Amino acid sequence: MNKYITLSLLGLAALASHAQDFDSKPTLELGNKEQDVKFTIGARMMTDAAYYHSDFTPMHSGAALTDARIRTSMTYRNWYFYADFGFGKGKFDQKNIFLQYAVKDKHEGNHAVKVGYYTDPAGSMARLTSLGSYHFISRAGAANALGTGRELGATYKYTNKHVTAYQGVFAENQYNKVDAGINGVSVAGRWVVRPISTADQTLHFGLNMRYAHLGGGETYNNVLKKSLSLGQSLETYVDENQDFSSCTLDWANNTFDVGAEALYHNKRFFVRGEYRHKLVTKKRDSKTLFEASNDNIDTWGTLSAWEAANPLRTNHFNGGYVETGFLIFGSPYHYDTNEAVLGGLKGKALEVVARYNYTGLNDINKGEYFSAGRNQYYPDGYMADYPYNSSSVGGGNVNSFTVGLNYSFNKYAQVMLNYTLHKVDKDFLPYDKTIHALQARVLFSF
């Protein structure tokens, strides 16, 4: 069998439709030509160092092994299996693992059906781009706070030179581990058109949408109570504190996400951006909760009075970013048509990049007063002893400005340097207005 097995540095042309799962084409391949089977293995390591300066709330400067992973794939004719496992920060973390069947039609269109655990199509353009191919140390905060990551599901994707249509259905928890209730379910899609699509430049416009019925939760006074948490770190992995921009939404029931994106690149310049809006609806069994509240001396008397004192409303959040880069020298920027994302640096290269990001997790009723000492909003506009509960959400708004310099030694090794200025607006942290972050990364991938 040895004459059929090779271990070599190959271009992997036969895997061209699958190589997007790796940051670069895998170096190691085992192949059995007789059985038409190919097996690849790759790895990635990221080590970050960061210095932070904040107005009041401390952040932990230092260094961390932020990512370490092993990646494997197997191809048999039109079948493709991929598995990716992480060991960063000293813990095991399952990444992508899926099976895909793909065929090409007579019009050069690609049809692919995928089943497994991987990034939601509507997760955002940033989340669909591998971090090893990203042009910044972290994805934009809005993509992390309002986008969606990996889920267990099944999708169908159609791609040709000018169009990508990617849609599917997903389960909320990949292991069906819920304390109460049932697993959540979502349907999502991303649709991209490319008016310009050549080897040297690409212009694309995209739309994505996602509807999710949330699952899980806890039993509270004999009522199922579901919650949704949203948040982001300050675009860093050394200290992933989300206190500056995060919220937990009790009684969350459904979410609806919509996003728009645009991307342009030529040989030495790129610009891309996204806008995202998230709507969260609420639901609860008010009658049962009201009856449970009557078991003590303090009661609201009627259901309508209790509902007025405990208001429930739909929340809206939004955010977006714009990123740009200029290649000083190196191989031209390139576009991955199958994934509809910008590729990473290839070979020896030097680039400068810049980004503006806005994340809005404040949804505050006009005229309400906030007590930082009690971490509480007061609907009447002043502090009271027995106030109604507020439906305001003060998760925090963040404006972030980043500049960076990236140098790639070769197709395997790269160093990155980012400086970010964050402007924070969160009622619970009134003394934190400006945060500075200086970060560096060493990246190795094969």
Residue spans of the language-model regions?
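Subunit-assembly interface segments of extracellular/virion macromolecular structures
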Residues: 22-24
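Hydrophobic h-region of N-terminal signal peptides that target proteins for export
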Residues: 10-18
